[in-house]
């Protein structure tokens, strides 16, 4: 009796992504560490100085985390309401933050109580930053104003009322202590100069501005709002260089890599995009579990921290280079081990005993071997198999079709099982590699369950989706055939023109030959 032959699973070539230096660089992070905060993480900021701690603003607290710690090393909770935008000074010794009650507070990293409190805004302060000289603070609030504060005197220096809506983002120049940028929900980004008491440049973003970023050189400005990330040339009067639209939802945060060669953007679509600052093309992408509100990179891009709307803080650390350790050398086998049995001579009375190799059968092969066709189909319709290895499911359907028992395997199913089969068909019917097998399966399942259509709303919806998918595929095929017809006509025209060239030596017009009609008499005959 012949043994059972396992089902041959057809393999298909997999087109992998192109491996680039950016892919290797940005994939070189460990598994993320997740920290639960008390509320949505609105801001993450790294200290520019060692030991590169980072401040996390969530709810009414500001937590200071060590670079590799999962517990806060310090907490600032002197806020009556929600805290916003905790930002380090360049020396890493002071921290400034806004709040929902309109008060800007200045903290010493080594203390707990605020060193300064700047009161002047009437509504929530969503953006604060230190100027380049480290002696002034810029703040923007929902009262449409931008204020400049003096740290030593705790006084307000200037107030700008240039915006007509909430001021939700801003940053100060790292080179010029008098320049700072603000973005507002009035769709504008304004650059202010403390020496002129007014904005010196205004660009129209076109959407409510959620984040702004000034390059370290001060020559380029990046604004984010809506689905757009726009780059402006400051040296050319705010000329738009490029408009990027790679996110599906609102872009909420921006960040630069340590080298300044890569721009990162986070969005509510749960993705972080990495752009090249030379070509402005996406070179890498990160996926997260929830919508992203804040993003920060540490020194040398060693750590990437992302804050999300569900209060989860995701921390990724770069993998350290594994040190090569010298293992103890194993003792090599003796020479006689290798030549053992080579000099043995077979005898006439020797009996050869062969042990049959035991074949390992998959679960679906065991079911098919026992003619349990329905169980075999159920096994390959499990979500794990359908998502990871759909070719296995298609191979089993093909084997059932070859045996002529596919209708038996599909019949007698309840609403949940029929829905699972229809979901697989909807997911893979339009793929060219699976279409020949699945079209036959779709016809069989329609024939079986056509009499009971209308008894289950869930199954009816799946059949409608399947019908729309087939109609859309037919439209695609019709358009492709029309395109092929157009191309054939063009190729035929080109071939005909190339095959009948006009010779260059043939004159355009041939001279007419003078011939006399045989019926007309000549002049000599007339004279005679």
From Swiss-Prot:
Q: Where are the WD repeats?
A: 36-75, 78-117, 120-159, 162-202, 204-242, 246-285, 287-326
Where, per UniProt, does this protein localize? Answer: Nucleus, Nucleolus
Is Transcription found in the keyword set?
yes
**Which is a GO BP term held by this UniProt record?**
rRNA processing
Coarse class of the primary localization is: nucleus
Positions where N-acetylalanine occurs in the chain:
2
Instruction: Point out the cross-link Glycyl lysine isopeptide (Lys-Gly) (interchain with G-Cter in SUMO2) in this chain.
Output: 249
One GO cellular component this record assigns the protein to is:
small-subunit processome
- Compositionally biased residues, Basic and acidic residues: 497-516
Print the keywords alphabetically: Acetylation, Isopeptide bond, Nucleus, Repeat, Ribosome biogenesis, rRNA processing, Transcription, Transcription regulation, Ubl conjugation, WD repeat
Region (Disordered) spans which residues? 496-528
Look up keyword Transcription and say if it applies. yes
Q: What interactions and quaternary structure are annotated?
A: Part of the small subunit (SSU) processome, composed of more than 70 proteins and the RNA chaperone small nucleolar RNA (snoRNA) U3. May be a component of the proposed t-UTP subcomplex of the ribosomal small subunit (SSU) processome containing at least UTP4, WDR43, HEATR1, UTP15, WDR75. Interacts directly with UTP4 and WDR43.
Q: What does this protein do?
A: Ribosome biogenesis factor. Involved in nucleolar processing of pre-18S ribosomal RNA. Required for optimal pre-ribosomal RNA transcription by RNA polymerase I. Part of the small subunit (SSU) processome, first precursor of the small eukaryotic ribosomal subunit. During the assembly of the SSU processome in the nucleolus, many ribosome biogenesis factors, an RNA chaperone and ribosomal proteins associate with the nascent pre-rRNA and work in concert to generate RNA folding, modifications, rearrangements and cleavage as well as targeted degradation of pre-ribosomal RNA by the RNA exosome.
Q: What is this protein called?
A: U3 small nucleolar RNA-associated protein 15 homolog
Species of provenance = Mus musculus
Per the record, the gene is Utp15
């Amino acid at each position: 009796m012949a043994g059972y032959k396992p089902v041959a699973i057809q393999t298909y070539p997999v087109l992998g992504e192109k491996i680039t230096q950016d892919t290797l660089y940005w994939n070189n992070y460990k598994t993320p560490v997740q920290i639960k905060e008390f509320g949505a993480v609105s801001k993450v900021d790294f200290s520019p100085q060692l030991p590169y701690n980072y401040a996390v603003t969530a709810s009414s607290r500001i937590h200071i985390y060590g670079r590799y710690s999962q517990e806060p090393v310090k907490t600032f909770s002197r806020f009556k309401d929600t805290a916003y935008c905790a930002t380090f000074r360049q020396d890493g010794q002071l921290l400034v933050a806004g709040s929902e009650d309109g008060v800007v507070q200045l903290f010493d990293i080594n203390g707990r109580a605020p060193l300064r409190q700047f009161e002047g805004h009437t509504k929530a302060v969503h953006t604060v930053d230190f100027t380049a000289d480290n002696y002034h603070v810029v703040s923007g609030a929902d009262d449409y104003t931008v204020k400049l504060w003096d740290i030593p005197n705790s006084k307000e220096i200037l107030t700008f009322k240039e915006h007509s809506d909430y001021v939700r983002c801003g940053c100060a120049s790292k080179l010029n202590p008098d320049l700072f940028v603000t973005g507002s929900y009035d769709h504008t980004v304004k650059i202010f100069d403390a020496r002129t008491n007014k904005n010196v440049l205004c660009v129209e973003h076109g959407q409510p501005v959620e984040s702004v970023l000034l390059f370290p050189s001060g020559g380029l400005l990046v604004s984010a709002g809506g689905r757009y990330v726009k780059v402006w040339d400051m040296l050319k009067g705010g000329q738009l260089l490029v408009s990027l639209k790679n996110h599906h939802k609102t872009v909420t945060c921006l960040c630069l890599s340590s080298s300044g060669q890569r721009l990162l953007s986070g969005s509510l679509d749960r993705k972080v995009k990495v752009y090249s600052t030379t070509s402005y093309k996406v070179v890498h992408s990160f996926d997260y579990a929830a919508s992203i509100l804040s993003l920060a990179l540490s020194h040398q891009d060693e750590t990437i921290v992302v804050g999300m709307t569900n209060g989860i803080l995701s921390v990724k650390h770069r993998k350290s280079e594994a040190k090569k350790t010298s293992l103890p050398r194993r003792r090599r086998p003796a020479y006689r081990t290798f030549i053992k049995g080579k000099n043995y001579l077979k005898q006439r009375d020797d009996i050869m005993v062969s042990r049959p190799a035991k074949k390992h059968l998959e679960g679906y092969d065991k079911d098919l071997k026992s003619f349990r066709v329905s169980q075999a189909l159920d096994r390959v319709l499990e979500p794990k198999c359908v998502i990871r290895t759909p070719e296995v499911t298609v191979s089993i359907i093909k084997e059932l079709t070859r045996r002529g028992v596919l209708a038996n395997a599909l019949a007698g199913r309840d609403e949940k099982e029929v829905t699972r089969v229809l979901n697989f068909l909807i997911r893979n019917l339009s793929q060219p590699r699976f279409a020949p097998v699945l079209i036959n399966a779709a016809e069989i399942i329609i024939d079986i369950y056509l009499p009971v259509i209308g008894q289950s709303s869930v199954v009816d919806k799946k059949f409608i989706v399947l019908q729309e998918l087939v109609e859309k595929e037919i439209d695609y095929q019709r358009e492709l055939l029309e395109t092929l017809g157009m191309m054939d006509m063009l190729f035929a025209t080109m071939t005909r023109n190339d095959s009948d060239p006009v010779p260059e030596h043939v004159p355009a017009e041939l001279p007419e030959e003078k011939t006399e009609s045989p019926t007309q008499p000549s002049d000599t005959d007339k004279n005679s």
